Amino acid sequence: MKIKYFAWIKDITNKEFEIIDRNHPKNIEELKILLKKNYPDLEKHLDQDVLRFAINLEYTLENHNLNSNDEIAIFPPVS
């Protein structure tokens, strides 16, 4: 699973992307829990539901199931 970060999210994670090979999250909600654990500065943004998630180039809802070969992009709010 590849997770891509954009804009100021890259600054918080210090990464443009990362690969999760083992024990990948099963849905967006689990991914959010993992991100909060790994990047505490993202927690308030994740809790406020201001970030957008796309799976394989399509925006998605939190209950969407994830597969090990998915590419997930995380975007901040845009005006």
State the predicted function of each range:
Residues M1-S79:
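Ubiquitin-like/PB1-type beta-grasp interaction modules and other compact soluble beta-rich domains
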